[in-house]
């Protein structure tokens, strides 16, 4: 037995052995072996606390295949982010080779659970599924919670805690498995879910950690080493040293702007050394990325060609994917990123550099948490490629290296603590208990509340629960009937569309001041909702935003009491949404307001969900059907980013906002207009190639014509069509 590696035990189940064979796993990592010993195959609840890259995903797969074989039912794998969901979907494809259908569920909160035995979902989506399908909890045989330490996140924590508590309270006997790389109080989390601990510090690639100051690397063991000063810029010299040794570097920095600036500087200095044919292939892919402002796509393409890239949440998914693939392939040697990458996709590097241990928000700065440092440092070391990984935290001029060593390298991550105490989280939690059942006793609410992490750590928050129930009652979402609480029709609808309960009083107040005949008013309403992702407005933008209000909705200035930072952020969000539904391009929106495509797509997705949800609850607030219809249409326009006349066309698969406008301007203004369109005519239009023409014709039920048109186009591309047609004519003449 090599250190940390174990043979698959003879007592492992057939399902585990089959999975290992298909996955190419010949020997088990230490945490994997420990999980088998702890009973992961037998349905034991577990908390697995082990470093990044130590095989936690395989443990999850073992739990899934054994649980489904043993008990049937369904398996859910929960993640905090959509990007992680898509990454896991790819790595879980092995399940299809075991006859298990896999689905991903991250979107519409109104949809029920997908029909598949294995589902990957975000926390929020699974929470909504429990509300839409109350019986689901009893049919889940295993629930895997990735990043279970997220229970201490202010935003997602209450949602995750609510999910686990309701699963513990359900009549079913689902196996619960929590996974984390940073959970120092794993024992307490295990006690919460009634499970065992699998705790290991073993890594497939050993980690070396240092503090960098004045071109010296300080080790926790007391070692000291000089870093060659080649470029006189520490990020370049630290990256270049790793590259020289056959590695790659991942540099985490505190802002998007700095990530871009450093990447450009690195490309100028290192580009000639790092450029390669493979890098140019990925560069070409980046330049063709869909949905990205041309300036951003071209900028990133030029950097990738030089073997350098940057990565942040503002990039569209297509560009983020290209950067990630180029880095994994080794075509890009250095990526400058914001810390969001550390919490998202798995992208390891030989050397990780933490450019600053501060974060900057609203003009203030504060040190990052130890858990955040550990998350970034955990990306160091590529399994199968590196003998070791290095994590380097950069000291400031007045820092003492030993303080950073004790404060970050040697320090344990912060305890995982419940965030359920806030009224907002508790209101959401309680409505999620009451609405699916229709009516419950206060004792039932206290029973589920007693199964929360908060209750374990601090006791049952009876006073806060009472205040939360009072709010829900005052807003018309529940009725208190002695010792029982019943959901109203409004409450059930709010729970079903998954809106924050506070949306109801906000909606009631805002409708007093707006006109539903004014699109900007409606978009401002959406932007004020508690769930909305708002765009912060800078001081320089405030004058332009006031002008926008005067142009779009002059009476808003008299109806809004105060335009502080939150209100200005809502105005900016409404302005950008108005541009979007008026078909402004991503380039225009980025150029005018500096909104990156990734942020725009996130905002659009949230706004569409809120608008749709408001359209559903409007009748329960006494608003007429016209209001519901207007909000429903606005929701569809936000989803597709179009003016009203294109709503029919964008429903056709493959026809987005740009192609829909092209079809409209060419005279195809409705489905009826397209019913008689010839494939050849469609393919002559800009951006309507054979594939899109085929999708249009198939949508119209003209399948044979679609296939024939695509075949003719392929022959034409190969230069065979004229030859075949000429041959056919010759044959006719011969007859």
Curated annotation (Swiss-Prot):
Gene Ontology molecular functions: 3'-5' DNA helicase activity; ATP binding; ATP hydrolysis activity; DNA binding
Database matches in Pfam families = DEAD (PF00270), Helicase_C (PF00271), Helicase_dom4_arc (PF21280), HHH_5 (PF14520)
List positions binding ATP. 32, 50-57
Q: Which residues form the signal peptide?
A: none
Annotated Gene3D superfamilies:
1.10.3380.30, 5' to 3' exonuclease, C-terminal subdomain, P-loop containing nucleotide triphosphate hydrolases
Protein EC: 5.6.2.4
Q: Which residues form the Helicase ATP-binding domain?
A: 37-201
Catalytic activity entry? Couples ATP hydrolysis with the unwinding of duplex DNA by translocating in the 3'-5' direction; ATP + H2O = ADP + phosphate + H(+)
What is the residue range of the motif DEAH box? 146-149
The Helicase C-terminal domain, residue ranges: 235-431
**Keyword annotations from UniProtKB, A to Z:** ATP-binding, DNA damage, DNA repair, DNA-binding, Helicase, Hydrolase, Isomerase, Nucleotide-binding
What does the record list as GO biological process?
DNA repair
HAMAP family hit by this protein: Helicase_Hel308
Q: What does this protein do?
A: DNA-dependent ATPase and 3'-5' DNA helicase that may be involved in repair of stalled replication forks.
Family label: Belongs to the helicase family. Hel308 subfamily.
Describe its partners and assembly state.
Answer: Monomer.
List the protein's name.
ATP-dependent DNA helicase Hel308
Give the organism the record lists: Aeropyrum pernix (strain ATCC 700893 / DSM 11879 / JCM 9820 / NBRC 100138 / K1)
State the taxonomy lineage. Answer: Archaea, Thermoproteota, Thermoprotei, Desulfurococcales, Desulfurococcaceae
